[in-house]
Amino acid sequence: MNINVAELLNGNYILLLFVVLALGLCLGKLRLGSIQLGNSIGVLVVSLLLGQQHFSINTEALNLGFMLFIFCVGVEAGPNFFSIFFRDGKNYLMLALVMVGSALLIALGLGKLFGWDIGLTAGMLAGSMTSTPVLVGAGDTLRHFGISGTELSSALDNLSLGYALTYLIGLVSLIVGARYLPKLQHQDLQTSAQQIARERGLDTDATRKVYLPVIRAYRVGPELVAWTDGKNLRELGIYRQTGCYIERIRRNGILANPDGDAVLQMGDEIALVGYPDAHARLDPSFRNGKEVFDRDLLDMRIVTEEVVVKNHNAVGKRLAQLKLTDHGCFLNRVIRSQIEMPIDDNVVLNKGDVLQVSGDARRVKTIADRIGFISIHSQVTDLLAFCAFFIIGLMIGMITFQFSSFSFGMGNAAGLLFAGIMLGFMRANHPTFGYIPQGALSMVKEFGLMVFMAGVGLSAGSGINNGLGAIGGQMLVAGLIVSLVPVVICFLFGAYVLRMNRALLFGAMMGARTCAPAMEIISDTARSNIPALGYAGTYAIANVLLTLAGTIIVMVWPGLG
């Protein structure tokens, strides 16, 4: 039996789609030196190659892909977007505006200089900024801008072509810039990170290991009684001196949870909770009594929970003000917008921040109720909320405003982004509403993006050879300019107008470009995860602005429509 693969794939859109995805994901795992191609570029390359062979896919699959992707971007940005936008992020907002705004203006100028149409120009902007949201926003706006069928088809093909020709240019140039730009300015990033660490008490150890606290029991000996000198537990401040706290005391066969007024006596058996290294550093006064192996005394369930900051008595407070250790809890991580932050007593908590806390289950529950709620560990997605807000986003995108003969609408991309932000924000404030496990959210987001990339590659593949011959050199120059010049402008603005700390500034610049590989290079150069503070500050805002940039570049293009 002979099987015609070409006819088989052309006759089955679903099969073609998953063949493109599988081959593209395999290609994306390849590395060029220290740079991995990545899933997006892998799928794009495979789809372009198959597109040259005149394979095509249903455009509805492409539309669904970009809708799922942009909605999930909004859900991820939602928990911290408003707090950054309205309160904590004036500098970060301005940096993101400078980065995206300058790139938009430069792209418009280069597009007109080289005589390109809106499709090539918007695609070049998206590729040079390595930003799929720009591509999504521009494509959606083109479809709803009243352009004729032939002109629309050409613009969409050129949009994909421009993106494909400049994506690697944008990615590689930014990674190279992230490695060498810090060396061209007079302040060393490592020194800048150490400086702000001293000012704010930051833990600059980016490779800090996290351990669960353990419980061990000791019998109180004469040395420990003499050390206490008749003081109660509150006066002793045992945690400050040892890194451990007393969870239980057995006295005369009676087991009790001590309060601050308890005084240790000879023969007491005490259960100490702390990290392993804290136990190892205990003064001999604690260990000279015989270690006790008492099942009841040691019966304690240590848990680690992710606590979401919500309550007004925690939002806006510094970490030190929570006094977690006074409540028998240990802080392992602070996560903001899916980015791990340095553990700093002076970090001001935002609504939606996630604190990873360890300790006795009862104590962790108490502290969680005081500052917010324990993140649900269910693997069940609230599909009703997901679908409802998706519908709301589509309806927002249908709204149009008429000004004389000119009409303006948000489009599906902006509508879904806004609806996703609202869902993410409400999820951060209401523990029982709209829960989507991070794994499920990442899977839907990644799948939507891959479907979208497959669609744009298949539609643009037939014209890529002509495009390379006619405009390849121009695209190379334009891609480098749009990728690097806004970064330099952003650096000058942040360094000499906002006068930001260089470690925070470079992190914020990479956040404004939403480029995680470049962020890793900045952290390595600084030998610190302090730049993550700046990255988190601009990342959520930049995702929104980049989507809007794709819409704006189409709307302001002269003579369109």
Swiss-Prot record:
Q: What domain of life?
A: Bacteria
One of the GO BP terms on file: potassium ion transport
Between which residues do disulfide bridges form? none
Transmembrane portions of the chain: 8-28, 32-52, 66-86, 94-114, 158-178, 383-403, 406-426, 451-471, 475-495, 540-560
List the record's Gene Ontology CC terms alphabetically.
plasma membrane
Where located? Cell membrane
Write down the InterPro entries for this protein, in alphabetical order: AAE_transporter (IPR050144), RCK_C (IPR006037), RCK_C_sf (IPR036721), Transp_YbjL_put (IPR023017), YidE_YbjL (IPR006512)
Kindly give the membrane topology term recorded for this protein. Multi-pass membrane protein
RCK C-terminal domain residues: 202-288, 292-373
The UniProt entry, under PROSITE patterns, shows: RCK_C
Query: Keyword annotations for this protein?
Result: Cell membrane, Membrane, Repeat, Transmembrane, Transmembrane helix, Transport
* Sample GO molecular function, one term: monoatomic cation transmembrane transporter activity
Name the family the entry cites: Belongs to the AAE transporter (TC 2.A.81) family. YbjL subfamily.
Looking up NCBIfam families in the UniProt record yields: PRK04972.1, YidE_YbjL_dupl
The name this protein carries in UniProt is Putative transport protein YbjL
| Origin species | Escherichia fergusonii (strain ATCC 35469 / DSM 13698 / CCUG 18766 / IAM 14443 / JCM 21226 / LMG 7866 / NBRC 102419 / NCTC 12128 / CDC 0568-73)
